[in-house]
Amino acid sequence: MSEPKNSLSASRIKTLQSCSWMYYAKYVIGIPDKSNDGANRGTICHLIFEVLGEPRRKKIYDKIIKKQDVFSVKSVEKLIFKHAKRLGVNDDDNIELIKKMTLNGLMYDFFGLSAGKPALAVSEQDFDIVVNDGKFKYKIKGFIDKLFLYKKQKFALIRDFKTSRETFKGKEVKDNLQDYMYSLAVKHLFPEYSDRASEFLFLKFELDDSKNSGIIRMAPITDDDLEGFEHQLTAIQEYLDNFSEEDAYSNFASKQPFPKDKTFSGPLQCGFAKYPGQLKIDGTPMWACSCKWAFDYFSTVDENGKQLKSYFNESDIPEGQKYEKRSYKGCPAHQKKS
């Protein structure tokens, strides 16, 4: 039996479910991905959580909590500014948001002691799991922001930090793809921890038990439900390992109905701009999906011409790398018919 080819992640599957062309453009063509301030702020927050999750840095953590300011430790301040400058989010507004969200995450049971002392606490627990046993066939890959393992209770607490401006909506609240993916990964990595639960912390919100809390706790997923998820993964794996340009035309976001559950899905994902650079009434650019319009880009390639990584700007390509200039024609659903 052949091995699964593509690594499945929650974000990859969600992209496929959201829009078949977006999946094709990002994962098959391999166009460069446009970052944004929100994602870049999140990258920095996650970095600080990983750094301060090390037991040997507990004194640094304690000082920050005592002062209620992540900049009370100069090395942390320098680290934040270093990466904020690199990612283009070093203006005052972005820095304040980074400070606030980082402190919020540090203040909330950062070492997982509310359920007792964990036998193991891991920051950025990665997983790369291949199953090909005749019944199931899939390859899942990703990482868990924080994982706490409580040996006596045989309990695994899975924690994910979110820096988005909204909490989950619609089915994501109770039937969450990340929750299933992480729970399955922990079952494979630590099978002796039979009780597993996920919590998502939205750092722009208060992390308390109020009505508008940024804490979303998921009900534990049963082994039967995880087995059902494995059947789904097997079907998705087969589909994506044979994904073609014809499949890319099968489920355009623009052809889907508008969402009724307040989720960011369907045509909303395309954006309402009718041409590149269209401005809103206030003079700011209208948002549009990064796959919507045509553009040129650059791809580094290996000796066989296989694409390694893509870039918007030629100046960003590492020195000495072989590369090609390529053209992306834009999303067919938004191209003007001649």
Predicted features along the sequence, with ranges:
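RecB-family 4Fe-4S metal-dependent nuclease core
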Residues: 1-338
